Regions:
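Phosphate-handling DNA/RNA-contact segment within nucleic-acid enzymes
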Residues: 1-86, 90, 104
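A charged alpha-helical hairpin associated with nucleic-acid processing machineries
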Residues: 38-47, 74-90, 94-229
């Protein structure tokens, strides 16, 4: 035991209350339920990250034991790195409301600088009337597992969310689309995934891939062919 975490039942603030931080207990590093979930994570090669303690408890009650939650904080790079050491795939599960989409976008942003080629991050956005607790009670564990297994990959979620924010139906929209994609592409550490996303962004923005690379000030590690004399 390195600390305690509490969650208000019903209305009240603060929603989450944790022990004071110490050298052993830092919220930005710890995940609720990770110790209990480790065996299931190793078995499934997948970990599901939900927003709250009670979501973890409800999922475990229905036999889904590979779920963890942050300690009332936003996802950090420390969380992502810790989970990637445990699993091949992270599924971030958020409510489908505006707050959930904001939290998902933050999780995507911090994942880009930690996700290597060969690992997977997915995003499962529930319908606005559900959180993981209510969904698994209403639809059952198998439905939740199926949704987690087929959740949107980071690449798909990133590009579709950018296009939702900046529709690419006009030149101005495409300009905003590229401008918002730029810092995300630049922070990626997975060169193969980065190149594929660069191509997707260029296609949607109706730009030549090399022109986009130049505009973003990026270099890609492409194999070069040597001309024979």
């Amino acid at each position: 035991v390195i600390g305690f975490g509490g969650r208000v039942i019903g209305a009240g603030e603060p929603k989450y209350l944790n022990s004071p931080e110490t050298p052993l207990f830092e919220k930005r590093r710890e995940l609720y339920g990770l110790r209990e979930a480790r065996e299931s994570i190793r078995k499934d090669s997948r970990v599901v990250v939900v927003e709250g303690y009670m979501d973890v408890v409800a999922l475990a009650q229905h036999g889904i034991e590979n779920a963890v939650a942050t300690l009332g904080t936003a996802t950090t790079s420390n969380h992502v790195l810790k989970l990637l050491r445990q699993a091949e795939e992270i599924v971030f599960c958020f409510d489908g409301d505006a707050a959930g989409r904001k939290a998902a976008w933050h999780a995507l942003d911090v994942s880009l600088a930690s996700l290597p080629d060969g690992k997977m991050v997915r995003f499962l956005m529930l319908s606005p009337e559900h959180d993981p607790d209510s969904f698994v009670r209403a639809e059952g564990a198998e439905a939740f597992r199926q949704m987690a297994a087929t959740a949107a990959p980071l690449s798909e979620f990133m590009v579709s969310e950018l296009a939702r924010r900046s529709p690419v139906t006009t030149a101005e929209g495409r300009s905003r689309f590229v401008n918002e994609a730029k810092p995300l592409l630049q922070k990626m550490v997975a060169p193969i995934l980065q190149l594929q996303l660069l191509r997707d962004v260029a296609r949607r923005a109706e730009l030549d891939e090399q022109d986009l690379t130049r505009l973003l000030g990026m270099q890609t590690n492409r194999p070069t062919s040597s001309a024979r004399p």
